[in-house]
Regions:
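Short amphipathic alpha-helical segments and their helix-coil junctions
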Residues: 51, 55, 102-116
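Glycine-rich active-site/cofactor-binding loop and its immediate structural neighborhood
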Residues: 112-124, 128-129
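Short Lys/Arg-rich cationic patches that frequently serve as NLS/NoLS or arginine-rich RNA/DNA-binding motifs
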Residues: 2-10
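C-terminal binding/interaction regions
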Residues: 12, 119, 141, 146, ...
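Intrinsically disordered, low-complexity regions enriched in acidic/Ser/Thr/Pro/Gln residues
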Residues: 12-44, 57
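Extended low-complexity intrinsically disordered regions
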Residues: 45-88
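Alpha-helical support elements that line or immediately flank enzyme active sites
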Residues: 127-139
Length: 183
């Protein structure tokens, strides 16, 4: 049986999710936590998909201007880790995205999935990394039963073009497909 990985404790407080990306990334770096997104499931044990999604919605809702939200997503994409080239394979590519986008699942023995993500375009990378973070450290059943309407709080209709919105829905379909797998 595999030994459960011990996680580093994070000096966490509720204000962290409303901090600027740079501030959160600095805290993560100071605590030697790498390859983690600002609202990360890797140090938020017990947070549900809905909790993490709501954290991102709160971050985006602090910005009145849609251009600020768009810029935040692109900055988030820039600061997010990249998927190693060896995983940029057709089987991990998300169909229906305007730019090449990869979503790589990492299944645990505890029936939990972690995701890593990348894209050739910054706005797509910001979205796919945010979704990867929201769904990481979740059970297959929680992922498979996620309701698409819960994304409404992200206000994608005003934020993204129809083509990019379709790409986000394709990303979610791929994520839910991994959650539905029986192997």
């Amino acid at each position: 049986m595999l030994k459960k990985e011990k996680r580093k404790k994070m000096p966490w407080n509720p204000e962290h999710y409303s901090m600027k990306t740079e501030e959160v990334m600095k805290i993560l770096e100071e605590n030697k936590i790498t390859n983690v997104h600002p609202v990360s499931s890797k140090f938020m044990d017990g947070w549900t998909i809905q909790d993490k999604l709501e954290s991102y919605i709160n971050i985006l809702n602090t910005m009145d201007d849609m251009m600020d939200r768009y810029t935040w997503l692109m900055d988030f994409g820039k600061k997010s880790a990249t998927v190693p080239e060896r995983f940029k394979l057709p089987e991990f590519e998300v169909p229906g995205c305007q730019s090449q986008t990869w979503l790589v699942p990492h299944f645990t023995y505890e029936d939990t999935i972690y995701f890593t993500a990348d894209s050739a375009a910054l706005i797509s990378k910001g979205m796919v990394c945010m979704l990867a973070d929201v769904f990481s450290n979740s059970t297959r059943s929680d992922i498979a039963t996620f309701e698409l309407k819960e994304l409404d709080g992200l206000n994608l209709d005003n934020l993204l073009t129809p083509g990019r919105r379709n790409g986000v829905y394709s990303m979610l379909k791929v994520i839910q497909g991994y959650g539905s797998r029986k192997d």
